[in-house]
């Protein structure tokens, strides 16, 4: 079985601890204890006009609207584009931007990122801590977030992980790297040889496909000889790697072949290495759809009796979402005090 862990959850962990580094520890599920933290978490009650802020160079680029699957993502996306292009541009596109999420939730890191960006654009003289958070959000967190959503197949998992390292090397300070590398190391599941080799056999460059096919075939021979259950260990990372194949040591004797390729013979792999044609199951490198499916299944089982009724409930729910998009929340209909 191919082990797949959510990359969107992975990128939240370094961001969480970099927020803690600059804003301090949380004082609850919706706030921080520091002055800046309180200003960010209470932003809905203290919104001000956008000032002539200093634009921040970032990596967030234009994405298709279909990738922006909820209001939080749309808000973060348009605000990021505005900060990169300046106050006049941001004011022009604010009509495309949904309202600020009504409550800050530190368990949903896209939400604090949006709050920090909104705080920045209304602050004439932002602190260095706030500036650094904006640099990290625009050059590391949000670019990775949208890249993972765009190329969501598991075959891209190792490439996204390597990109996370590369972006961090370019925009993190040495102190920030010291804080963040720990969480790269303990969550390097997508840098496991099985994920790296899967990305390699699907790579557009023939030389990389051929190299990975040879490693997979050799690993298969060794696995057949031992006939043991493979131990899955988080690999040691090379943070100075020039490409994704170098971020771990693929010459180690404990390298194992990707389970997702078990139905492909050695000859199939050699052919794939030559022409690049491969069909794999649609498995994502993030778990957003899984989490939504779990929620829908739980709701259906609570409201219906029997598997057939529960299944019909889920199908109706999916059809309703497609035909009647959800755009309103309870707060839109309840007068604010």
Model segments located where?
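Alpha-helical structural modules in large enzymes and assemblies
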Residues: 1-337
């Amino acid at each position: 079985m191919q082990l797949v862990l959510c990359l969107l959850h992975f990128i939240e962990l370094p961001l969480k601890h970099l927020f803690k580094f600059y804003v301090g520890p949380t004082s609850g599920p919706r706030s921080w204890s520091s002055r800046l933290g309180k200003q960010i978490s209470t932003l809905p009650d203290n919104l001000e006009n956008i000032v002539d802020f200093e634009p921040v160079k970032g990596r967030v680029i234009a994405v298709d609207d279909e990738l922006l699957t909820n209001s939080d993502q749309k808000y973060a996306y348009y605000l990021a584009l505005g900060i990169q292009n300046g106050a006049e541009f941001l004011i022009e596109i604010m009509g495309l931007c949904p309202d600020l999420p009504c409550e800050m939730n530190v368990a949903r890191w896209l939400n604090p990122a949006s709050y920090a960006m909104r705080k920045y654009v209304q602050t004439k003289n932002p602190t260095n801590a706030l500036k650094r958070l904006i640099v990290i959000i625009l050059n590391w967190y949000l670019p990775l977030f949208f890249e993972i959503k765009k190329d969501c197949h598991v075959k891209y998992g190792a490439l996204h992980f390597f990109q996370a390292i590369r972006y961090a090397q370019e925009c993190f300070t040495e102190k920030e790297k010291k804080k963040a590398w720990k969480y790269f190391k303990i969550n390097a599941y997508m840098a496991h040889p099985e994920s790296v080799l899967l990305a390699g056999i699907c790579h557009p460059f023939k030389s990389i496909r051929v190299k990975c096919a040879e490693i997979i075939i050799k690993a298969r021979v060794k696995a057949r000889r031992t006939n043991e259950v493979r131990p899955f260990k988080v690999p040691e990372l090379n943070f100075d790697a020039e490409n994704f194949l170098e971020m771990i040591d693929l010459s180690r004797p404990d390298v194992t072949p990707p389970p997702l390729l078990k139905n492909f013979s050695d000859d199939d792999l050699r052919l794939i290495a030559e022409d690049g044609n491969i069909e794999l199951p649609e498995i994502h490198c993030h778990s957003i759809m899984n989490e939504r499916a779990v929620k829908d299944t739980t709701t259906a089982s609570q409201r219906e009796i029997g598997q057939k009724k529960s299944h019909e409930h889920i199908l109706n729910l999916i059809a309703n979402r497609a035909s009647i998009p959800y755009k309103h929340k309870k707060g839109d209909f309840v007068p604010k005090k």
